[in-house]
């Protein structure tokens, strides 16, 4: 790792520790995914903080062609993973930075012996639980999404937490694409879709993550959650707003944002 990557990582870690915004990118922006993951790995080393899972996001064309990947990943720290209870979950976000909410399926990893899964069908054997949920995306750097996938990767994949909702029965895993999903913010619907629009779906996202971790020398752990990708889109949200995701025939989950 070069010193510049370490300095960028340290700036993001410090900003996240202290809930401070960064008005500018703290260094030279990475121009390729390899450089971006070097920064992400340096941040993980700085934290020395338990990981509870990983978020997977989509890289759209033409950037996916230029970068050689159609997805990206980022760490989810264990202390930012919440389970739905009687009251609405509350998540801190960066006021003055970037914040968004995403309806997603959450997959719990159960690593197996042998080669990594190459297809979404094979990836099902590496998962022992699926839940509905919400990913909270937030960064101290407000232009993180505007600056593109490499910048997103360099700041923890733009993740700030996960909410785990109801379980999806194992008999339904083959038909996740048939489950209609909608997302509301403060009572207004902002998106509606299904995983049929998502590359090779949630299990394909898990397979991608496992390959990414292997390439980086990170061994997957049982119990890690995979936030498998935004179904209805990436919807910006502000402190005080409430998000509700509904998964037809499965249930709903909701969370309130608060200033960090």
What are these model-predicted stretches?
Residues 206-238:
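A conserved acidic, glycine/proline-rich C-terminal tail/linker
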Residues 2-201, 238, 242, 252-260:
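Catalytic-core "active-site belt" of small-molecule-metabolizing enzymes
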């Amino acid at each position: 790792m070069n010193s510049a990557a370490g300095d960028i990582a340290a700036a993001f870690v410090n900003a996240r520790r202290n809930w401070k915004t960064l008005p500018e990118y703290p260094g030279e922006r990475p121009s390729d995914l390899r450089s971006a993951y070097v920064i992400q790995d340096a941040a993980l080393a700085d934290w020395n903080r338990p990981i509870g899972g990983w978020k997977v996001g989509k890289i759209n064309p033409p950037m996916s062609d230029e970068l050689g990947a159609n997805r990206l990943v980022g760490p989810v720290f264990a202390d930012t993973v919440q389970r739905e209870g009687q009251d609405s979950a509350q998540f801190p976000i960066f006021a003055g930075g970037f914040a968004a909410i995403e309806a997603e399926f959450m997959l719990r990893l159960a690593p197996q012996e042998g080669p990594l899964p190459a297809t979404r069908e094979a990836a099902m054997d590496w998962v022992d639980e699926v839940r509905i949920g919400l990913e909270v995306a937030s960064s101290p750097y407000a232009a993180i999404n505007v600056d593109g996938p490499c910048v997103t990767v360099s700041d923890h994949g733009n993740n700030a937490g996960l909410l785990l909702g109801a379980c999806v029965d194992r008999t339904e895993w083959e038909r996740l694409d048939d489950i209609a999903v909608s997302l509301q913010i403060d009572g207004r619907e902002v998106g509606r879709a299904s995983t049929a629009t998502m590359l090779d779906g949630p299990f394909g996202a898990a397979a991608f993550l496992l390959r990414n971790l292997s390439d980086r020398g990170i061994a997957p752990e049982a119990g890690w959650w995979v936030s498998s990708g935004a179904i209805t889109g990436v919807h910006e949200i502000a402190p005080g707003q409430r998000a509700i995701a509904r998964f037809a025939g499965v249930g709903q989950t909701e969370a309130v944002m608060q200033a960090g």
